[in-house]
A protein has these predicted regions:
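Short glycine-/small-residue-rich Rossmann-like dinucleotide-binding loops
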Residues: 98-99, 123, 250, 256-258, ...
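Rossmann-like dinucleotide/phosphate-binding beta-alpha-beta segment
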Residues: 166, 181-276, 384-402
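Alpha-helix C-terminal capping/helix-to-coil transition sites in glycosyltransferase folds
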Residues: 89-90, 111-114, 247-248, 273-276, ...
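Residue-level detector of alpha-helix initiation sites
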Residues: 124-127, 142, 146, 202
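Conserved beta-strand positions in the Rossmann-like core of class I SAM-dependent methyltransferases
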Residues: 72, 219, 287
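Rossmann-like dinucleotide-binding domain for NAD(H)/NADP(H)
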Residues: 277-402
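Phosphate-binding beta-alpha-beta segment of Rossmann-like dinucleotide-binding domains, i.e.
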Residues: 136-138, 143-194, 206-209, 213, ...
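An N-terminal-biased, well-structured beta-alpha scaffold segment characteristic
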Residues: 2-139, 267, 392, 396-402
């Protein structure tokens, strides 16, 4: 029997919900492009419940314990005295999330001789040192596409919020004001702007499709060029490199994976090549942007706004400069963990576990590392290497509600 260690974010400060605003969520049959949704043999939760927090347990406890496995669920993941570090040495399977990542570094993997499977409940497995996973024979899998549409919707929301200056306008209402000039002095129409995406995979392409009705000019870069049919359908302009694209764009949205080649891609030099007053929306990974370069660009006016829900490390310490920099629209990492998305990535996590325990192949699109090599989605989107350095700063986080 196996020991499964599941690292999830904390419950709401008001306690685990006893009821929800909606009685049901839409039943999505397929993903765009024909990929099927997660297909476990059964689930032990009602879609629309809070599954991604500690008490939600991804709906896995009944399934695992009825088969004799041990499930340990915790939010304690950072520092040498964390529950993660205490439980890891005799753990067979680790489940984590991008939103509250259990950083599986070389040091941690070396202390976990029994660990054979690391599952990301969601998409994006950069919290795992993939080179170390290959070295130690750990299979890495994630629930591809489970929250791609969720994230793409969040991107469009953030673009509109920045360009239309929504957050300051909302704050005037909360403060009891009616300061229209203050609201509109930084407000523009999105119509007619040039909008580009760094990567046009599942999320990036979904963003492009959702932006087309806004009558914008769409641009993209990707190491796998889209088909001519899609380029014609969306009237896309393909660029051979990121420098070419950012020079012409008013809005840039980042939708690529984090790996050594994309780490700190948006630094002082690249931002200086952008239009003055451009906007960046980053729901990919915080480390793709140089933290201090973003802050400097907002303070100087080179950027008109920056929004996103990804930070490095996560959770972000209270003194992280992105919390207080001007003209930002940051949120905690929530774009891919709506209640709708949770139902899908919880089901996908169970599907992966069922395959693992029954010695059936995990579907190819879920695999990142397998058999000592990058595999499946990992071979398509990642590169070997480590993007976890600096994770220790997450130990500085103190819950602002305590």
């Amino acid at each position: 029997m196996s020991k499964i260690l599941c690292v999830l974010y904390d419950d709401p400060v008001t306690g685990y919900p006893k009821s929800y605003p909606r009685d049901a969520i839409p039943n999505i049959k397929t993903y765009p492009g024909g990929q099927t949704l997660p297909s476990p043999k059964a689930i032990d939760f009602k879609p629309g419940q809070l599954l991604g927090s500690v008490s939600g347990e991804l709906g896995l406890r009944k399934f695992l314990e009825s088969r004799g496995h041990t499930l340990v669920v915790t939010s304690s993941k950072d520092g040498p005295n964390s529950r993660l570090d205490k439980e890891l040495p005799d753990t067979d399977i680790v489940i984590s999330q991008p939103f509250w990542p259990a950083y599986l570094t070389e040091e941690r993997l070396a202390k976990a001789p029994k660990l054979k499977l690391a599952i990301t409940a969601g998409i994006g497995s950069d919290h795992v040192d993939l080179q170390a996973a290959i070295k130690h024979g750990v299979t890495v899998a994630e629930v591809s596409y489970s929250n791609s549409i969720s994230v793409s919707e969040h991107v469009v929301m953030m673009i509109l919020s920045l360009v239309r200056n929504y957050i300051p306008s909302y704050q005037w209402v909360v403060k009891g004001g009616w300061n229209i000039a203050d609201c509109v002095e930084r407000s523009y129409d999105l119509e007619g702007m040039n909008v580009g995406t760094v990567a046009a995979g599942r999320i990036g392409l979904a963003v492009l499709r959702r932006l087309k009705p806004f009558d914008v000019k769409l641009h993209y870069i990707d190491r796998h060029r889209l088909s001519l049919d899609i380029e014609k359908e969306l009237n896309l302009t393909f660029h051979p490199n990121v420098e070419s694209m950012v020079k012409v764009c008013d809005v840039v949205t980042i939708n690529c994976p984090l790996h050594p080649e994309t780490e700190h891609m948006f630094d002082d030099a690249l931002i200086a090549k952008m239009k003055r007053g451009a906007y960046i929306v980053n729901t990919a990974r915080g480390k793709i942007c140089d933290r201090d370069a973003i802050t400097r660009a907002l303070e100087s006016g080179q950027l008109a706004g920056y929004a996103g829900d990804v930070w490095f490390p996560q959770p972000a310490p209270q003194d992280h400069p992105w919390r207080t920099m001007p003209y930002h629209g940051m949120t905690p990492h929530v774009s891919g963990t709506s209640l709708s998305a949770q139902a899908r990535y919880a089901a996908g996590t169970r599907e992966i576990l069922e395959c693992w325990f029954e010695d059936r192949p995990i579907r190819e699109e879920y695999l990142i590392v397998d058999g000592g090599h990058l595999a499946g989605a990992g071979a398509h989107s990642y590169s070997k290497g480590n993007a976890t350095s600096g994770w220790e700063e997450a130990t500085k986080y103190k819950n602002g509600t305590s």
